[in-house]
Swiss-Prot record:
Membrane-traversing stretches: 7-27, 342-362, 368-388, 438-458, 469-489, 516-536
Protein name (database record): Membrane protein insertase YidC
Keyword Transmembrane (UniProt): yes
Record localization: Cell inner membrane
HAMAP family, sorted: YidC_type1 (MF_01810)
Signal peptide: none
The species this protein was found in: Pseudomonas entomophila (strain L48)
GO molecular function, one term: membrane insertase activity
Pfam families: 60KD_IMP, YidC_periplas
Length: 561
C-alpha cells in the first residue's frame, strides 16, 4: 500500500499541473503571434492621428433585421481628417476618432506597462497598425448615420479635453447634422472611475419621423495579450464573454467565433472582452432588450457587441439613449457594482467558488497589513490552522508508520521478492497496529483544490500585478527572478521527507527522493506569491509534524516504561 500511496501523491502532483495547462488550452487563447511594439513615453502614448490605410475601425458594422429597415441607405460623409480627439482624466487617457466617434486609443496611467518604466502607461486600446482593439458605437437602422458605406464625421469645439483639478466630471460632445437631424454623441467621464457613459442625443428637426438603433461593440484582432505572462505555460483567457439570462458568465472564445457567430436576445446584460488583469465591457440599459452578437469580420477581427431596440423620433421630437463602457482593471468590487455577473470576468477557472472566498480573505488581511506578501503569509497560517485536524491525523499516521518501520524491514527480509505475501503481511501489520496506510494522503487531497484556487487568485487578480513583497521580490505575480524561493521550497520538501518513514520499497524510495527536484523544477516559473505560500506552508508543516512525531514518540516511551 505504501507504493500506491506514493504513486497517488506523484499522480496528484502531475495531474494538478496538467489540469492547469489543460484548463488554459480549453479556455485560453490559441497560440498567437507576438507583437513587437516600440515603447513610448506617457505623453506620446496617444498619437494625434491613425496611420493611413488602417480601416479596421470602420469596417463591418452590425446589421439590423429587415423588419427594422436596413435597405436603401444613402452614403454617409467620408472623413477628410484623421486627427484624433484627446481626452484625459486622472485614470484614463483616450483618443476618439471623429469618424464614427470610436475610442481607438486608451491607456491607463495608474498602471505602468513595466515596473522599471513607470512613466509608460499600459495601453489597452490600440488601432495603430500593430494591433486592433477598440470600442465602437453608433446609430444604425433606417435613418442611422452609421452605415456600412461610411461613418459620420463628428465635430468638436476643441481637439483635446482634460479633467481639471477640482473637477469631478468631464463631458465631451461630438456633433453631427444630416437631413435636418442633429446628433450629439456625448462622452461623460468621472474622476477616479474607469467607467464612462456614451450617450446619443437625437434632435429631429426634419419633417419626417426618424428611426434607428444604437449599437455598441468591441473589436479585436488575434494578436497576443500584452498584459499576459506565459512563462508557466498557462496564459490566462483572452477572448469574449457575455451575460445571458441562463448564464451569468458565458465565454465565447476566438475559436468559437472561427466556427460561426452567436446571436442571442438578452434583456440588459453586458458584453465584454477579457485579457490578463484587464477587461472592457459594454453595459446597456437594464430595461432594454438587446440583440447580442459575436462574429469574425472580413478583416479577421473578432467582434462582440449588441444592437439595442428600435428608436423612433417623431418630426420635431428628441430622444436620448446611452450605454456604459468600462475599460480598465478587473477590480471585483467595482465590476459587481456596475452589473450582475461582471465580477466573474475575474476568471478564477473551475475552482472560482473556492478562489473568491480566498481573495476576499486575502483582501481583508491586506487592508490591515498593507503588503500583499505578508498578507499571503498570514493567509497561509490561517489555512494551515483550518486544516490542522486533518494534518494532525496525517502526521500521527506517519509517526505510527515510522514506529513500525523495523517490523516492515523484517517482513521484507522474510518474504523477499514475493510481493503478494509481502503485501498481505503488511496489511495484517497495519490492521494490528491500527494504521491507515493512506492516512497521509488526505491533507494533500484536501489542500490541492485550495492550492489550485490560490494559484488562479495570484495569477488573475490585478491587485497582485507588480505588487512587491520585500528585498528581491518586487512582483508577486511573476516568477522569482533569482529562483531563490523555489530552491527554498525544494529544501523544505527534502526536510519533510526526512521526517517521514523511509519507504520499504527501494523503487518507491527513489521516487520520493526525486519529488523535491520535480516540484522545484515546476515551481521555478510559478508566481512568486504562490511559491511563497508553499514555502510558508511547508515550514509550518515541518514544525507541526516534528511536534506531533516527538509527542507520539514520547508517549510511546512513557507507555513502554
Amino acid at each position: 500500500m505504501d507504493i500506491k500511496r506514493t504513486i497517488l501523491i506523484v499522480a496528484l502532483a502531475i495531474v494538478s499541473y496538467v489540469m492547469v495547462l489543460k484548463w488554459n488550452q480549453d479556455y485560453g487563447q490559441a497560440a498567437l503571434p507576438t507583437q513587437n511594439t516600440a515603447a513610448s513615453t506617457a505623453n506620446a502614448s496617444l498619437p494625434d492621428s491613425v496611420p493611413a490605410g488602417n480601416n479596421g475601425a470602420n469596417a463591418d458594422l452590425p446589421s439590423v433585421n429587415a423588419q427594422n429597415g436596413t435597405t436603401g441607405l444613402a452614403p454617409a460623409p467620408v472623413a477628410v481628417s484623421k486627427d484624433l480627439i484627446q481626452v484625459k482624466t486622472d485614470v484614463l487617457n483616450l483618443a476618439i476618432d471623429p469618424v464614427g466617434g470610436d475610442i481607438v486609443q486608451l491607456t491607463l496611467p495608474k498602471f505602468p506597462r513595466r515596473q522599471d518604466h513607470p512613466e509608460i502607461p499600459f495601453q489597452l486600446f490600440d488601432n495603430g497598425g500593430e494591433r486592433v482593439y477598440l470600442a465602437q458605437s453608433g446609430l444604425i437602422g433606417t435613418d442611422g448615420p452609421d452605415r456600412a458605406s461610411g461613418r459620420p464625421l463628428y465635430a468638436t469645439e476643441q481637439k483635446s479635453y482634460q479633467l481639471a483639478d477640482g473637477q469631478d466630471q468631464l463631458v465631451v460632445d461630438l456633433k453631427f447634422s444630416e437631413n435636418g437631424v442633429n446628433y450629439i454623441k456625448r462622452f461623460s467621464l468621472k474622476r477616479g472611475e474607469y467607467d464612462l457613459t456614451v450617450s446619443y442625443l437625437i434632435d429631429n428637426q426634419s419633417a419626417q419621423a426618424w428611426s434607428g438603433n444604437m449599437f455598441a461593440q468591441l473589436k479585436r484582432d488575434a494578436s497576443s495579450d500584452p498584459s499576459s505572462s506565459t512563462a508557466t505555460g498557462t496564459a490566462t483567457y483572452l477572448g469574449a464573454a457575455l451575460w445571458t439570462a441562463s448564464e451569468p458568465y458565458k465565454k465565447v472564445s476566438m475559436k468559437d467565433m472561427d466556427k460561426g457567430g452567436l446571436q442571442e436576445n438578452v434583456a440588459g446584460g453586458w458584453v465584454a472582452w477579457l485579457q490578463h488583469y484587464f477587461v472592457t465591457a459594454w453595459i446597456p440599459s437594464k430595461s432594454d432588450n438587446n440583440a447580442v452578437q459575436t462574429r469574425k469580420d472580413s478583416q479577421g477581427n473578432y467582434i462582440i457587441g449588441y444592437t439595442g431596440p428600435a428608436l423612433n423620433v417623431p418630426a420635431g421630437g428628441k430622444v436620448e439613449t446611452s450605454a456604459m463602457l468600462y475599460a480598465g482593471p478587473k477590480i471585483q468590487s467595482k465590476l459587481k457594482e456596475l452589473s450582475p455577473g461582471l465580477e466573474l470576468t475575474v476568471d478564477y477557472g473551475f475552482l472560482w467558488f473556492i478562489a473568491q472566498p480566498i481573495f476576499w480573505l486575502l483582501q481583508h488581511i491586506h487592508s490591515l497589513l498593507g503588503n500583499w506578501g505578508w498578507s499571503i503569509i498570514v493567509l497561509t497560517m490561517l489555512i494551515k490552522g483550518l486544516f490542522f485536524p486533518l494534518s494532525a491525523a496525517s502526521y500521527r499516521s506517519m509517526a505510527r508508520m515510522r514506529a513500525v518501520a523495523p517490523k516492515l524491514a523484517q517482513l521484507k527480509e522474510r518474504f523477499g521478492d514475493d510481493r503478494q505475501k509481502m503485501s498481505q503481511a503488511m496489511m495484517e501489520l497495519y490492521k494490528k497496529e491500527k494504521i491507515n496506510p493512506l492516512g497521509g494522503c488526505l491533507p494533500i487531497l484536501v489542500q490541492m483544490p485550495v492550492f489550485l484556487a490560490l494559484y488562479w487568485v495570484l495569477l488573475e487578480s490585478v491587485e497582485m500585478r507588480q505588487a512587491p513583497w520585500m528585498l528581491w521580490i518586487t512582483d508577486l505575480s511573476i516568477k522569482d527572478p533569482f529562483f531563490i524561493l523555489p530552491i527554498i521550497m525544494g529544501a523544505t520538501m527534502f526536510i519533510q521527507q526526512r521526517l517521514n518513514p523511509t519507504p520499504p520499497d527501494p523503487m518507491q524510495a527513489k521516487v520520493m527522493k526525486m519529488m523535491p527536484i520535480i516540484f522545484t523544477f515546476f515551481f521555478l516559473w510559478f508566481p512568486a506569491g504562490l511559491v511563497l505560500y508553499w514555502v510558508v506552508n511547508n515550514c509550518l508543516s515541518i514544525a507541526q509534524q516534528w511536534y506531533i512525531t516527538r509527542s507520539i514518540e514520547a508517549a510511546t516511551k512513557k507507555a513502554a516504561a
